[in-house]
Structure formats: structure tokens, C-alpha cells
């Protein structure tokens, strides 16, 4: 199978990044072809990996994420894969590795209500729903049992 792994930034020392690398290398060892999509790649590329760095720029993270998602969708339409595995919340994933906590829970409980009026909030809430909404049909790999009820609640 051709697998696409998607993450917003790869650098060799992050926890999410180490999890991604471990999983991708194991999939490769089992005979799958590995393609990686990211706007930022720092470090060596493992032999056999097809790393595609998105040529995008934006001042705000949420705008960069939107541009990256559009670029990713266009590239996958031109050159499809069997499964898309994401390590950050975004539309179009077949599988999501839940390394981050529930954004909506943090926005509702830890932020001022005015926070929810801003584009940044709307973006991240929408991307979380794109993964966790029942209509999304995304397979979720939870690494924290504590977070699961929060995702279900929101």
C-alpha cells in the first residue's frame, strides 16, 4: 500500500515527530511505500521516503494550515495514495494519531469567551470537527485515555 503521512512540522526531536517516524519506519519495514507531506522538514530523510515539502507561506499558523490543506488535497488528487495518516488535525484524513489534546475543550474551559470570536478559534475548531465528527469516518488512534471523553463531549 502507498501510505501518506501528514504533519505540520518535522524535526527529529519532537515527541509527535518521533512517534510519526517510528510508525512510518515500521510501515515501511512491513512493505508499504511511504510518502510524507509537510510544510517544514528538518533533518535527514530516511531512505525510501518520498518527502514532499509544501511551498507555502503565511503570517498566521491557521492561514498556513489552510494553505497546506489545499496544497495537500491538490497533490493527492494528482497522485493518490491508499491511506492518509495525519499527526495533526485537518480535513481529509483516513487515520488520525491523536497526540494533541482536545482543542474545543481547552477553548471552552481555559479561554475567555471572546476567544471564540476570532478566526484562529474557528479554524482550529473546524479542523478538529473534520477529524472527530461522526460524518468524518476518520479512524482515531488515541494515546491518552484521559482525552477520549473530552473529544466525545465536544
Model-based region annotation:
Residues 7-13, 26-63, 75:
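N-terminal strand-loop element at the rim of the active site
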Amino acid at each position: 500500500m502507498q501510505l501518506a503521512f501528514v504533519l505540520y512540522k518535522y524535526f527529529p526531536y519532537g515527541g509527535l515527530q518521533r512517534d510519526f517516524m517510528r510508525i512510518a519506519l515500521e510501515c515501511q519495514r512491513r512493505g508499504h511505500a511511504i510518502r510524507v507531506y509537510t510544510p517544514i522538514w528538518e533533518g535527514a530523510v530516511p531512505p525510501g521516503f518520498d518527502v514532499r515539502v509544501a511551498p507555502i507561506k503565511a503570517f498566521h499558523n491557521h492561514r498556513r494550515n489552510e494553505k497546506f490543506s489545499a496544497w495537500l488535497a491538490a497533490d493527492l488528487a494528482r497522485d493518490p495514495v491508499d491511506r492518509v495518516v495525519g499527526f495533526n488535525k485537518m480535513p481529509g484524513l483516513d487515520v488520525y494519531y491523536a497526540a494533541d489534546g482536545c482543542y474545543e475543550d481547552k477553548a471552552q474551559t481555559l479561554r475567555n469567551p471572546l476567544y471564540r470570536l476570532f478566526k484562529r478559534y474557528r479554524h482550529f475548531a473546524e479542523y478538529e470537527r473534520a477529524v472527530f465528527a461522526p460524518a468524518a469516518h476518520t479512524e482515531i488512534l488515541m494515546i491518552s485515555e484521559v482525552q477520549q471523553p473530552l473529544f466525545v463531549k465536544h
